[in-house]
UniProtKB/Swiss-Prot annotation:
Cystine pairs: none
EC class of the enzyme, as a word: hydrolase
Keywords from the UniProt entry: Fatty acid biosynthesis, Fatty acid metabolism, Hydrolase, Lipid biosynthesis, Lipid metabolism
Name listed for the protein in its UniProt record: Putative acyl carrier protein phosphodiesterase
Gene expressing this chain: acpH
Organism whose genome encodes this protein: Shigella flexneri
Length: 143
């Protein structure tokens, strides 16, 4: 949903040539980091932990009809509290390394961590530029 936003396309250009191919994946993880980190500002009336419980309940209703790999992934993500833990950059690095380990074609995800680190402040600025606009569009079903 975010890949075609001008701020996101600009951020993809900040990745080095050897990691640019995985920039969309890395940026999706990074946007989740900022979402988790700034949740209390973005949703002051719905604490993150309550949202996680609510979201889990919603997903659990579709799990019985889902493929086994999706079920296993969800069981792991929920039990490990990923969205809550995304606020920690060390966890983000572990997530990228884990993805790279599971998918050899995505090995560049390991090194994309350095692009995030080098451009952290600029990425956070871009997040604040597009996220409120994206949420307004979503609330009007204009995405």
């Amino acid at each position: 949903m975010t890949d075609n936003l001008p701020e996101v396309r600009e951020a993809q250009e900040w990745f080095r040539s050897e990691t640019r191919r995985v920039a969309p994946i890395t940026l999706d993880v990074m946007w989740d980091h900022f979402l988790s980190r700034h949740w209390s500002q973005l949703s002051p009336d719905f604490p993150l932990q309550e949202f996680v419980c609510y979201a889990r309940e919603q997903v659990m209703t579709i799990l019985p009809d889902s493929p086994p790999r999706f079920i296993n992934l969800n069981n792991y993500l929920w039990s490990e509290q990923w969205l809550v833990r995304y606020r920690d950059m060390d966890f983000i690095q572990n997530v990228l390394n884990g993805m790279a380990s599971r998918r050899p074609r995505l090995d560049a995800l390991r090194d994309s961590w350095y692009d995030l680190d080098a451009h952290y402040d600029a990425l956070e600025t871009r997040f604040w530029q597009f996220y409120p606009r994206m949420m307004a569009q979503a609330s009007h079903k204009a995405l």
